[in-house]
Amino acid sequence: MINTTSRRKIEHLKLCAESPVEARQVSAGFEDVTLIHRALPELNMDELDLSVDFLGKRIKAPFLIASITGGHPDTIPVNAALAAAAEELGVGIGVGSQRAAIDDPSQEDSFRVVRDEAPDAFVYGNVGAAQIRQYGVEGVEKLIEMIDADALAIHLNFLQEAVQPEGDRDATGCLDMITEICSQIKTPVIVKETGAGISREDAILFQKAGVSAIDVGGAGGTSWAGVEVYRAKESRDSVSERLGELFWDFGIPTVASLIESRVSLPLIATGGIRNGLDIAKSIALGASAASAALPFVGPSLEGKESVVRVLSCMLEEFKAAMFLCGCGNIKDLHNSPVVVTGWTREYLEQRGFNVKDLSLPGNAL
């Protein structure tokens, strides 16, 4: 029998594949970011080095296929396609929340298939902050072992939990548990927002807690509050529907969140990454890697080759952006100046950041 968590996972996958679930009136902010064009790059585009060391593992490009799904039998071919594409192109990949496999161990194969199809890739596990108090360190270690994970993402989806009728709305004690997990396990821990962004205040807390990386998961991409609107309509839950509509675009946009989160930790830029230029802008703004989920949902339902086609295009766009900025490797792009204008600049200046420093050589706030 399929449990509630497993059923919800397949509902989420279908909604993301078939319904408009992206932000409506808020943007990730990449239109406010201008890379500095070098008219004479003095580089051979075919010889650029896109590879990077990320949390102890070398990947061929600074990109991760973000957590999408798992926990239902129908998700096995989806995760297999995603993982096989990641393995072929040498990028990283995350699994969806492994909660369903804790509730029902028969669902483990829907997650384990990722490591089976991507034996050499950077693979991260995934569990919600609301669940780690229940699972404890021992339970978290089981999730890591399940997929031989290179890292574990603890996702922060309290916006979705607040909207979801069956959501877990108790966030007390999560930071202490994150701190305990970081001190007890050897595997790197990533704290991952899921669409509402990370503030400066929280980035500092996570750094003190001992996490290894922060995935900013900013507003401007998939809205999980929006996803829950469709579920609420289906169940005729008018309160949850109203909450989801109101908070559809809530949160800190991705670009602003990247700047907010610039502490001495690797950053992952997620939220509205839709092309290689977005990836390049993210790296120039300080991210160690970028990631996306929604662009691969539809292709993953078609199979590996469709995922490879979409991802290859994004990576070629990324390479072109590096070339046109005169950057031969990722370190060069990290130090490449950028100009931030518009709403994003206004927001960041009101938050106390001097964005003009980003436009200077060295690109340091």
Curated annotation (Swiss-Prot):
Cellular component aspect of the GO annotation: cytoplasm
Top EC group: isomerase
Known catalytic reactions: isopentenyl diphosphate = dimethylallyl diphosphate
InterPro entries the record matches: Aldolase_TIM, FMN-dep_DH, IPdP_isomerase
Binding, FMN: 67-69, 97, 126, 192, 222, 272-274, 293-294
Residues that coordinate or bind Mg(2+): 161
Requisite cofactors: FMN; NADPH; Mg(2+)
Superkingdom in the source lineage: Archaea
GO biological process assignments: isoprenoid biosynthetic process
Cytoplasm among keywords: yes
Binding site for substrate: 8-9, 97-99, 160
EC code: 5.3.3.2
Subunit architecture: Homooctamer. Dimer of tetramers.
Family: Belongs to the IPP isomerase type 2 family.
Protein name listed in UniProt: Isopentenyl-diphosphate delta-isomerase
Organism, as annotated: Methanosarcina mazei (strain ATCC BAA-159 / DSM 3647 / Goe1 / Go1 / JCM 11833 / OCM 88)
Lineage of source species: Archaea, Methanobacteriati, Methanobacteriota, Stenosarchaea group, Methanomicrobia
